[in-house]
């Protein structure tokens, strides 16, 4: 999509960096200093839809820490332009320009033009409390010249996943699709009730597992931690390497004072466990490190469980928060980073 000007976007065979096609962006006229934004939606909100008959929920595709690359080629009349990548935050609505990654489509010092595709790459900085709604590129006309027409080609956009961020749940808004359908921004969910209560994410159910998910299904080796507070009931857990409603691992607390590692293959089963005296309404920092087929579980920075899954191991997946039975679990925040 594009904004700021009347712009034509078309898929074309005229140019290509790789393959046979690219995205052609045309603006008929730009005054000096004006700009055009071309962007990709990483996350959708209710205002993007005319109705909610499908009752969707969304998690972002792009996260802080990810690297974005794109191939860009300008027409001869557009090579005096500068392009600057940006992201847009769903929570604040703020546009964050990554000016250090800006690219001149020609070399103004050498007075040369470039008639080939150029690679522009940028890494999104580590942030707290941000949901990336858009990633994009802003094209600026020279400050001393009007320009028209403006034409560039974009190709080979790649998202290289390297999430490194933290979310406090009291910063997240609710997405309100209609009177009956609301959800916490950035989360999808399975069963039960998922809501914000006094700044905490609250997940509750009555029989089958109630779960909320976020992240990208191709995340592989990472460290994931959350501040968790068991409420009512006897099953309270965080989820990792989630591959949909039927497959994931989980770590957390269970009845009879146990710390447990589960594996879900349609239903949950215990992989390993150890004694751990936990209390309702007490906060714990629950952490999992997953690397290859090995998992280590920490509580308050102390390692309690280690496991190597040698049978149909799940090697990638997103993250989540869950409970089971007549339980209610609270989560204050979470943090994730990739392992080296």
Task: For each feature predicted by the language model, list its residue ranges.
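Extra-cytoplasmic beta-strand recognition segments
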Residues: 1, 23, 42-85, 118-124, ...
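Extracellular carbohydrate-recognition regions
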Residues: 1-7, 12-14, 152-188
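Short carbohydrate-recognition loop motifs
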Residues: 8-46, 188-211, 258-260, 317
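Beta-strand acidic-aromatic groove motif in beta-rich domains, primarily in extracellular
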Residues: 34-38, 77-89, 133-134, 233-243
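Secretory/extracellular carbohydrate-interaction modules
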Residues: 49-55, 77-78, 203-268
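Extracellular beta-strand ligand-recognition surfaces/modules
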Residues: 70, 84-85, 118-156, 285-289, ...
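Extracellular carbohydrate recognition and processing domains
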Residues: 90-132, 272-284, 288
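Ligand-recognition surfaces built from glycine- and aromatic
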Residues: 147-168, 312-340
């Amino acid at each position: 999509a594009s904004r700021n000007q009347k712009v034509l976007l078309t898929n074309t065979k005229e140019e290509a960096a790789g393959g046979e096609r690219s995205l052609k962006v045309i603006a008929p006229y730009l005054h000096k200093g004006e700009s055009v934004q071309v962007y990709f939606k990483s996350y959708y909100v209710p205002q993007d839809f005319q109705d909610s008959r499908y009752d969707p929920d969304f998690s972002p595709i792009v996260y802080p820490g990810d690297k974005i690359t794109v191939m860009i080629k300008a027409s001869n009349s557009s090579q005096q332009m500068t392009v600057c990548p940006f992201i847009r935050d769903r929570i604040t609505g703020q546009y964050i320009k990554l000016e250090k990654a800006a690219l001149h489509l020609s070399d103004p010092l050498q007075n040369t033009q470039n008639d080939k595709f150029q690679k522009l790459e940028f890494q999104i900085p580590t942030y707290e409390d941000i949901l990336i709604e858009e990633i994009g590129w802003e094209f600026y006309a020279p400050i001393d010249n009007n320009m028209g027409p403006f034409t560039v080609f974009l190709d080979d956009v790649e998202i290289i996943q390297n999430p490194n961020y933290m979310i406090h749940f009291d910063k997240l808004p609710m997405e309100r699709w209609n009177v009956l359908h609301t959800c916490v921004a950035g989360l999808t969910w399975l069963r039960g009730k998922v809501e914000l209560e006094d700044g905490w994410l609250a997940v509750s159910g009555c029989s089958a597992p109630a779960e909320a998910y976020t992240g990208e299904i191709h995340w592989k080796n990472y460290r994931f931690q959350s501040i968790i507070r068991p409420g009512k009931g006897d099953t309270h857990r965080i989820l990792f390497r989630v591959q949909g409603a039927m497959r994931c691992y989980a770590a957390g607390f269970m009845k009879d004072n146990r710390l447990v590692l589960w594996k879900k293959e349609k239903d949950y089963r215990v992989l390993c466990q150890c004694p751990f005296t936990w209390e309702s309404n007490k906060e714990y920092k629950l952490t999992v490190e997953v690397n290859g087929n090995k998992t280590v579980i920490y509580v308050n920075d102390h390692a309690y469980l280690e496991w190597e899954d040698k049978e149909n191991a799940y090697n990638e997946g997103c993250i989540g928060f869950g409970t089971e039975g007549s339980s209610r679990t609270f989560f204050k925040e979470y943090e994730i980073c990739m392992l080296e």
